[in-house]
Amino acid sequence: MADKLTPSDVKGLFEKLSNWGRWGKEDQRGALNFITNEKRVAAARLVQAGESVSMALPLATIPAPDNPNPVTHLMVQAGGDAHEQALPYSGDYFAIAPHGMANTHIDALCHVFWQNKMYNGFDASEVGSHGAKKCAIDVTRAGIVSRGVLLDIPRLKKIEWMEPGQKILPEDLDAACLPWLHERRIAVLGCDAVSDVVPSGYDGIMLPIHVGTLVAMGIHLIDNADLDAVSSTSVKLGRNEFLFSMAPLILERGTASPVNPLAIF
């Protein structure tokens, strides 16, 4: 595939790679349907060392340029109030806006739209002021357990980090692009940023990876994963594959959930 596609090429890919109707016209799970019971059993057999690694960032409570909606953490009851209670306890309250570039989260298939449609052709109007009636994040209520593979592009290129705006091409993954993901039946894609280059470089297409995965193929996205520890563990053990396990919160009608993805080697 050429390095630079035209906007028309990208729009054509959305149609060519579409999974709409693949699992029925009412399907809301998308590529999660690729994860069968047999695949979960096979993934469990990947555990050899028993080492479990988190791929989540701490919830960001401090305002920053990349965190305009910080997590609110308030104490409902604290230790200093214990003497006033028949049963002393501590408790807290959290308010989270999961989307953005600060917190590790999984996008629901209703998160973005293309030509006023979400995955499987459901209309954007299915998401209203009370949340999403279709393709909400609670379709993941049984958890996501499968084989995980780390694609460590900086290590492949023998560099410390990727430069801002630097693209990852298919040859980087075979020695990310939409056809590569489609051919391999990827169920979930995660990244230490937001998977898309910003700006995209394609007129009229703001987030082509988001549109191609969430809308066209029904692939859920994990944004802002912390991959440093899993990368170092991968190097130490000489393995890039592991048992992947994640249980998003059951947020009915939600467009996302904060998550703590685990890699178990």
Show the residue positions of the predicted features.
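Active-/binding-site microenvironments in catalytic and ligand-binding cores
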Residues: 1-265
